[in-house]
Structures are given as C-alpha cells and as structure tokens.
Amino acid sequence: MPTLIVLFNLRDDASVQAYEDWAQTVDVPTVTGLGSVDAFSVHRVSGLFGADSPAPYGYVEVIEVNNLDALVQDVSSEVMAAVSAQFQTFTDAPVFMLAERFAGP
C-alpha cells in the first residue's frame, strides 16, 4: 500500500489557528472520505529529536493510499480542487513524497 507523505511549513502570512482549524474541519474529513484513502493524519512537528536546532518542517501529513490510480482520479475532482487551493493558501512549498512500506506491520 503506498503512503503519501507531505512535509510543509505554513506561509508567513498564514494563521496557525486558522490552518489547524481548517485541517480538522475540512482537510481531514474530505480526504478521509475519498475511496482511494484508508487513513489520513496531520502531525505538528515539535522539534528534532536529540537536537536544539529547529526542524526543517512544521507539519507532516501521512496519507495511506489503497489505490494510487484512484487517488489521481479523486484529487482531480472539483471538491478536491477546492481543498487543494485552500491548502495552498496556508502552505509554503509543500513536498509530496510517495513511499512504500517494506518492513514492519
């Protein structure tokens, strides 16, 4: 099962509270409602383990995908286009990485 991992920071002009409220009320419910997605979680990064330097990203999204071709279709819908446009108003240069689990449960 592929996993989409998204790393990002908020834009300087984005409100943390507005983004986190939007993520909980719009982003997560919409994405978890897609037939191609089994699970979706958003994580606030609190720091680098064992280091005093700041983390390079403030947020991480983890999207467990059950069908990558179906996800491509799902994200091209009008609803997801609107959600994506809203996401872009909050985020600064998000990085979308596709990963495959090869070890562990």
Where are these regions (language model features)?
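Macromolecular interaction modules
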Residues: 1-105
